[in-house]
A protein has these predicted regions:
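Short hydrophobic/aromatic beta-strand or adjacent loop that forms the aromatic wall/cage
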Residues: 1, 73, 146-150
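N-terminal leader/capping segments at the start of a protein or of a new domain
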Residues: 1-42
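Conserved Nudix-box catalytic region and its N-terminal flanking loop in Nudix hydrolases
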Residues: 18-28, 79-116, 121
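Acidic, metal-coordinating catalytic segment for phosphate/diphosphate chemistry
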Residues: 31-75
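Conserved beta-strand and immediately adjacent loop positions that scaffold enzyme active sites
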Residues: 75, 84, 171
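Conserved hydrophobic "DFG−1" position in protein kinase catalytic cores
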Residues: 78-79, 152
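Unchanged
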Residues: 101-190
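Charged phosphate-binding loop/patch that engages nucleotide di/tri-phosphates or the phosphate backbone
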Residues: 190-201
Length: 201
């Protein structure tokens, strides 16, 4: 399955209709369905969730995103010795540390750098790739697709995280997954995908 977010809306491409409600299910017919969904999501005050069903999801996905410029990014879900995970609060939503890859960086290098910059935690050790997420946003005069490589990282020190305020990060807090599930403030859909990926392991 392939999934892309635009604000709180998402479009997914898969081989069978989902069991969840509140999703509009359509057959994949044309690459322009990506733009149609974006326009619907922009004009609606509520999240718009589309599922495009096809026997060939990889081919359909490549056609849907072919016209979009892609920016590569990387980030991390950090786990401490107590089994808690580090989340940051930025722009009125809970998020995870991440950022664009610099030229010449590998995704792993970028993920470590971004987490260290945004939380001041070091040393960090990558224990594995969790997932990739996609989201679309308006950049200057066009829509852009950001692909983020997410890694599970371990931190065994006792230093408290320090939020990078220049990046609008207000808080950085350790939580177990039960505490995370009880959060009252909004959480980015991509972050929920990352958390689901670690609970599925």
């Amino acid at each position: 399955m392939y999934k892309v977010f635009f604000n709180d809306s998402f479009l997914q491409v898969c081989t069978a209709p989902p069991t969840e409600k509140n999703r509009e299910v359509k057959p994949f017919t044309t690459p322009t369905q990506m733009d149609e969904w974006i326009n619907c999501a922009r004009e609606s005050s509520n999240p718009i969730h589309w599922t495009l069903v096809t026997e060939h999801p990889q081919q359909a996905w490549q056609q849907l995103i072919a016209h979009l410029p892609i920016i590569e990014a990387a980030g991390g879900l950090v786990r401490n010795a107590d089994g808690k995970y580090l989340f940051i609060y930025r722009r009125k939503r809970w998020d995870l540390p991440k950022g664009k890859m610099d030229e010449g960086e590998t995704p792993e290098q970028a993920a470590l750098r971004e987490v260290e910059e945004e939380t001041s935690l070091t040393p960090l050790k990558i224990s594995g790739l969790l997932t990739h997420t996609f989201h679309i946003y308006w950049l200057r005069d066009h829509f852009t697709l950001k692909r983020t490589h997410w890694y599970l990282m371990d931190y065994n020190g006792n230093k408290a995280p320090v939020p990078q305020t220049i990046e609008d990060i207000e808080r950085a807090e350790w939580m177990n997954l039960e505490e995370f599930s009880r959060l009252q403030e909004p959480v980015f859909g991509t972050v929920l995908e990352v958390v689901r990926s670690v609970t599925a392991k």
